[in-house]
């Protein structure tokens, strides 16, 4: 029940009307019997600074940041977590002692989603398709303990991420273009971070051949609408374990929830809340 002691959490983005986050977080709040509420706010870029200052002034506990504000928000924060600095984007802000502190939980969300299937993600050969914002978050997390190759239509974008991570993590990260004929048997985990195959363009997929993919490979697509992309269907036909983007969405949200409240939410509660409305 909302009262004068209810703590405020939220989502800042533009647009936000189709977001699954309020449903997911409010179910987790209800399950843990916490006096919080999570709301979505459609905010234009020119109002971001005012939102951060206002959130501190009225005592918000924190908020998520989504498209298109994940980079711009950084200039208005008092402190930024090291992983978020490496990624170059923030998706979670905690308000503490009148300070706005930025985090990025996207990469952690991807890793935990994969670990549901195979356990600890360490010492694997991983192929990441795409070099956008989501790719950077995933790569920053997975490059710490794995052998990473990033491929992208514009090779220079993949090169930038690979060089950044190689320099900052002291771990070689490889890169290439989409027109190369890659031996898929070399990879244990393959992740599509592009929008190819997302609704309504469900007949699209990354131009990657599954011909000699390992049967015990794990194939992940960050897309969750549709729940099974053409990319995942082809991988499943080859005997691979497949993961859509729902797990990443849930786990990144769960990590944000824990950062704000100090409480670990029930993953299944969050998952069922989303499945019920999809």
Swiss-Prot record:
<comment type="function">
    <text>Involved in the biosynthesis of the chorismate, which leads to the biosynthesis of aromatic amino acids. Catalyzes the reversible NADPH linked reduction of 3-dehydroshikimate (DHSA) to yield shikimate (SA).</text>
</comment>
<feature type="binding site">
    <location>
        <position position="245"/>
    </location>
    <ligand>
        <name>NADP(+)</name>
    </ligand>
</feature>
<dbReference type="GO" id="GO:0050661">
    <property type="term" value="F:NADP binding"/>
</dbReference>
<feature type="binding site">
    <location>
        <begin position="152"/>
        <end position="157"/>
    </location>
    <ligand>
        <name>NADP(+)</name>
    </ligand>
</feature>
<keyword id="KW-0028">Amino-acid biosynthesis</keyword>
<feature type="binding site">
    <location>
        <position position="91"/>
    </location>
    <ligand>
        <name>shikimate</name>
    </ligand>
</feature>
<dbReference type="InterPro" id="IPR006151">
    <property type="entry name" value="Shikm_DH/Glu-tRNA_Rdtase"/>
</dbReference>
<dbReference type="InterPro" id="IPR041121">
    <property type="entry name" value="SDH_C"/>
</dbReference>
<feature type="binding site">
    <location>
        <position position="222"/>
    </location>
    <ligand>
        <name>NADP(+)</name>
    </ligand>
</feature>
<protein>
    <recommendedName>
        <fullName>Shikimate dehydrogenase (NADP(+))</fullName>
        <ecNumber>1.1.1.25</ecNumber>
    </recommendedName>
</protein>
<dbReference type="GO" id="GO:0009073">
    <property type="term" value="P:aromatic amino acid family biosynthetic process"/>
</dbReference>
<feature type="binding site">
    <location>
        <position position="224"/>
    </location>
    <ligand>
        <name>shikimate</name>
    </ligand>
</feature>
<keyword id="KW-0057">Aromatic amino acid biosynthesis</keyword>
<dbReference type="Pfam" id="PF08501">
    <property type="entry name" value="Shikimate_dh_N"/>
</dbReference>
<dbReference type="InterPro" id="IPR046346">
    <property type="entry name" value="Aminoacid_DH-like_N_sf"/>
</dbReference>
<keyword id="KW-0560">Oxidoreductase</keyword>
<feature type="binding site">
    <location>
        <begin position="19"/>
        <end position="21"/>
    </location>
    <ligand>
        <name>shikimate</name>
    </ligand>
</feature>
<dbReference type="GO" id="GO:0019632">
    <property type="term" value="P:shikimate metabolic process"/>
</dbReference>
<comment type="subunit">
    <text>Homodimer.</text>
</comment>
<dbReference type="InterPro" id="IPR013708">
    <property type="entry name" value="Shikimate_DH-bd_N"/>
</dbReference>
<comment type="similarity">
    <text>Belongs to the shikimate dehydrogenase family.</text>
</comment>
<dbReference type="GO" id="GO:0009423">
    <property type="term" value="P:chorismate biosynthetic process"/>
</dbReference>
<dbReference type="Pfam" id="PF18317">
    <property type="entry name" value="SDH_C"/>
</dbReference>
<keyword id="KW-0521">NADP</keyword>
<dbReference type="InterPro" id="IPR036291">
    <property type="entry name" value="NAD(P)-bd_dom_sf"/>
</dbReference>
<dbReference type="InterPro" id="IPR011342">
    <property type="entry name" value="Shikimate_DH"/>
</dbReference>
<feature type="binding site">
    <location>
        <position position="66"/>
    </location>
    <ligand>
        <name>shikimate</name>
    </ligand>
</feature>
<feature type="binding site">
    <location>
        <begin position="130"/>
        <end position="134"/>
    </location>
    <ligand>
        <name>NADP(+)</name>
    </ligand>
</feature>
<feature type="binding site">
    <location>
        <position position="106"/>
    </location>
    <ligand>
        <name>shikimate</name>
    </ligand>
</feature>
<feature type="active site" description="Proton acceptor">
    <location>
        <position position="70"/>
    </location>
</feature>
<dbReference type="Pfam" id="PF01488">
    <property type="entry name" value="Shikimate_DH"/>
</dbReference>
<dbReference type="InterPro" id="IPR022893">
    <property type="entry name" value="Shikimate_DH_fam"/>
</dbReference>
<comment type="pathway">
    <text>Metabolic intermediate biosynthesis; chorismate biosynthesis; chorismate from D-erythrose 4-phosphate and phosphoenolpyruvate: step 4/7.</text>
</comment>
<dbReference type="GO" id="GO:0004764">
    <property type="term" value="F:shikimate 3-dehydrogenase (NADP+) activity"/>
</dbReference>
<dbReference type="GO" id="GO:0008652">
    <property type="term" value="P:amino acid biosynthetic process"/>
</dbReference>
């Amino acid at each position: 029940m909302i009262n004068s002691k209810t703590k405020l959490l939220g989502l800042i983005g533009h647009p936000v009307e189709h977001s699954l986050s309020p449903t997911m977080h409010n179910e987790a709040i209800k399950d843990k019997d916490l006096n919080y509420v999570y709301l979505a706010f459609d905010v234009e870029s020119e109002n971001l600074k005012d939102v951060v200052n206002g959130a501190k002034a009225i005592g918000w506990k924190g908020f998520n940041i989504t498209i298109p504000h994940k980079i711009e928000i950084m200039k208005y924060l008092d402190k930024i977590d090291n992983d978020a600095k490496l990624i170059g984007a923030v998706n979670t802000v905690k308000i503490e002692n009148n300070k706005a502190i930025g985090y990025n939980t996207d990469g952690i969300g991807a890793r935990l989603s994969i670990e549901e299937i195979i356990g600890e993600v360490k010492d694997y050969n991983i192929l990441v398709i795409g070099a956008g914002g989501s790719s950077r978050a995933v790569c920053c997390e997975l490059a710490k303990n794995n052998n990473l190759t990033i491929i992208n239509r514009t090779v220079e974008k993949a090169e930038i991420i690979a060089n950044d991570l190689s320099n900052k993590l002291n771990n070689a990260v490889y890169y290439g273009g989409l027109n190369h004929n890659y031996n898929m048997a070399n990879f244990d985990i393959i992740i599509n971070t592009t929008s190819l195959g997302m609704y309504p363009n469900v007949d699209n997929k990354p131009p990657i051949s599954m011909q000699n993919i390992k049967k015990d490979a794990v194939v992940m697509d960050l897309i969750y609408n549709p729940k099974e992309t053409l990319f995942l269907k082809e991988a499943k036909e080859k005997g691979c374990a497949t993961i859509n983007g729902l797990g990443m969405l849930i786990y990144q949200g769960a990590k944000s929830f824990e950062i704000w409240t100090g409480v670990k939410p029930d993953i299944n509660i969050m998952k069922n809340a989303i499945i019920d409305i999809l």
